[in-house]
Design a protein with these regions (language model features):
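Short helix/strand-bridging catalytic loops that position acidic/His residues to coordinate divalent metals
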Residues: 4-5, 97-100
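Alpha-helical segments in soluble extracytoplasmic regions
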Residues: 10-12, 24-67, 101, 105-120
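Long, amphipathic, charge-rich alpha-helical segments that form helical bundles/coiled-coils
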Residues: 60-96
Length: 121
């Protein structure tokens, strides 16, 4: 049986992760679905914001973990954060979303996001 204090700390840690996850999910969705139109500068800016949202989102999620975060949740968040970093860095390196390995990363990130959401229910 857990002590009430540790249960409260775990609940607080989970709430911090939930808030961060909701913010990151919104930011990544918003920035990766923006339309730069036909202007090459705008298209480049939209792509940069998409990559930034993933890189910053990864760091933001990881910064919200603490020792009281339930282990299953912490592992799922770390997995998602790593995938977001990998996607962003490979995009910056010129790897297209249609590349087989990058496409797999994108699918894995979606699955990891679903997993985090399930744990947070």
């Amino acid at each position: 049986m857990s002590e009430p204090n540790s249960d409260a700390k775990a609940a607080d840690a989970k709430a911090r992760v939930r808030a961060a996850f909701e913010t990151v999910t919104k930011a990544v969705s918003l920035q990766t679905h923006a339309d730069g139109g036909k202007d090459p500068v705008a298209v480049t800016a939209v792509a940069a914001n998409a990559r930034l949202s993933m890189t910053a989102g990864s760091a933001y999620l990881l910064s919200r973990l603490d020792p009281a975060t339930p282990p299953e949740l912490a592992a799922a968040v770390r997995s998602l954060a790593e995938l977001l970093e990998d996607i962003a860095m490979n995009s910056l390196a010129g790897v297209a979303n249609e590349d087989a390995v990058q496409a797999a990363r994108l699918r894995d990130a979606e699955a990891a996001s679903v997993r985090v959401a399930e744990i947070l229910k």
